[in-house]
């Protein structure tokens, strides 16, 4: 890897994350938590955004990320993990992904 690409990628990811924070609350996000490479400072040129979203929804879990991809139209690779407040409360102590995400993730927005 050539020097500087990781830093440039980090700036691109930060810029896109900032845009998400501006737009997502208007679309129903109650909490936005950055997880993955950017949240732990381990960015490579292949890194994307991983975002844990808390929102009220009746949609099945497997369909929830599509809403965010459709509405935000990310300019970088972005994965959305969407939970309802009740699911987050019920699973935060038992689900390995949530336990790790909540311990290392960076809260970017909360309505509470």
Describe the residue ranges of each PLM region.
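Catalytic core of pol beta-like nucleotidyltransferases
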Residues: 1-31, 39-45, 55-112
